[in-house]
């Protein structure tokens, strides 16, 4: 679980086969092949704000590399710093878990989330200063295919440093 609807393009080079997953543009992630989020989500300062607020203690950067697996690698750079290799984990995708909780007991309820085998995590630094922060995530799959995505958020303060 954790892949949006999509299809595969199969590339052949003599006897070599390279599959490439393409998400349908109608999904929540459009045609992105990576979903980047914070878990737990930021404590938002405004109900209609997007990625502006405070980090909670133990916040992780979580990346879902759609159709990824243990033979792939995911790296992240925070604010132009050195690239850090993320840890591969089999776990429930927090994005799907949030949708499940949001729509529970409604006509649009989601099925109970299952663990995803294409999740990578990185513990967020607990010393990030207030202000804008930019994360660049890069992945390389087992076939050498490369993906790049970004995530920007604004810290008004950092609750993680208050513990």
Place the predicted regions along the sequence by residue.
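Short, intrinsically disordered/low-complexity patches at protein termini
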Residues: 42-44, 97, 108, 158-159
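Flexible, low-complexity linkers/stalks enriched in Thr/Pro that connect modular domains
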Residues: 152-163
């Amino acid at each position: 679980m954790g892949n949006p609807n999509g299809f595969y393009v199969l590339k052949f080079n003599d006897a070599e086969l390279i599959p490439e997953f393409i998400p349908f543009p109608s999904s929540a992630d459009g045609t992105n092949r990576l979903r980047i989020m914070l878990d737990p989500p930021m404590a938002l300062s405004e109900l209609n704000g997007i990625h502006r607020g405070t980090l909670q203690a133990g916040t992780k950067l979580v990346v879902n590399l759609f159709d990824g697996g243990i033979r792939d690698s995911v790296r992240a750079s925070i604010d132009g710093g050195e690239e850090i290799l993320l840890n591969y984990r089999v776990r429930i995708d927090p994005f799907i878990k949030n949708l499940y909780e949001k729509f529970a007991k409604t006509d649009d309820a989601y099925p109970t989330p299952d663990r995803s085998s294409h999740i990578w995590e990185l513990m967020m630094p607990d010393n990030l200063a207030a202000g804008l922060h930019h994360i660049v995530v890069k992945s390389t799959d087992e076939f050498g295919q490369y993906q790049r995505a970004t995530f920007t958020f604004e810290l008004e303060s950092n609750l993680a440093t208050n513990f």
